[in-house]
């Protein structure tokens, strides 16, 4: 994220989207980390054949199908993708809050007109009904307030709305601030 205060040129050096190898590798890591895909290949109709070293086309298709079925699991795929795409590709300048904020302090500051800024480079996404920050899926009950975290780089009471009355959201927001992902503007 770059911010300029006057006309400027912008150059991108070396940052590009993932390739197929990156995607497959990352998804395979996710499958292993979450102990998914534990079903074994089986072919109950297999009989002795004349050429024991030959693999039939239908056998390859069944194996390919097993692999593709892993990717077709919508919740697992969404969880992997949200984590993958919000993982930073470069080191962020994260400075956890010192001292840590209490939930009441966060609410009072925001209701008092203070604004939060998102850490530059932090990846925050809304995918379906899920929200991801820095490769982590958020668990909360206030979709509108979480959507505001994804939508705005600077936000306050107006953007967060009724989320500031939701204890689960306030707890989540306070944790994110204390981790250094958002900070109060000076």
Where is each model-derived feature located?
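A conserved active-site cap/scaffold subdomain adjacent to cofactor or substrate pockets
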Residues: 1-76
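Exposed alpha-helical structural elements
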Residues: 23-26, 62, 144-145, 168, ...
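Short glycine-rich, low-complexity/disordered patches
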Residues: 40-46, 77-86, 161-163
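Helix N-terminus capping/helix-initiation residues
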Residues: 56, 102-103, 156
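Short amphipathic alpha-helical interaction segments
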Residues: 163-178
